[in-house]
Amino acid sequence: KKFDHTVDPSTLPVEEKGGAVVFSKDENGIVRFAMVHDVFGYWTLSKGGIDLGESPEEGTIREIKEEIGLDITIVEKLGENEYVAHHPEKGKIRKHVHYFLTESVYQPLVLAAGTGGLDQAKWFELSEIPELMMYDDVTKLIAGAIEKITMLTAAH
């Protein structure tokens, strides 16, 4: 039997992250999503590390403010996701991401300097979302978010 060199993920150090599907609904009822563009050419969700002593919600609110300059309100949790990544110092680590559906005022996005791996932040209308190049997990999260927003906005 060949020796298995794959690492058992449960033994790896965990990095907690918070991410958000950020939507805005303007006075005309137009729903838009705030997305960030990464250096690999994909539109993705703004996310960042949760500090020690912060709840996933608090960390996500702080990170979105730092990364794209928006004050967000958490509507509900969308789910969690975990993947193994390579850290320059620690080697292999588990990244555990908490995703939230969040709402914000429609205002210009300001991508912070030094947000590693990101080169753009932009709002997209609902109709533009299917055209975007996105990761599968992001597509699923946005699809779930759209369903929830449709239900929320129908109620008002």
Name what the model sees in each region.
Residues 44-47:
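A short gly/proline-enriched turn/hairpin at secondary-structure junctions
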Residues 19, 32, 120:
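Conserved beta-strand and immediately adjacent loop positions that scaffold enzyme active sites
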Residues 15-18, 40, 94-97:
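Short connector loops at helix/strand junctions that flank enzyme active sites
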Residues 26-32, 89-92:
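Short, solvent-exposed loop/turn segments that connect beta-strands within catalytic domains
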Residues 34-37:
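Short, acidic/hydrophobic/Gly-rich beta-strand patch recurrent on exposed beta strands
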Residues 50-140:
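Unchanged
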Residues 1-28:
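Acidic, metal-coordinating catalytic segment for phosphate/diphosphate chemistry
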Residues 131-156:
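Charged phosphate-binding loop/patch that engages nucleotide di/tri-phosphates or the phosphate backbone
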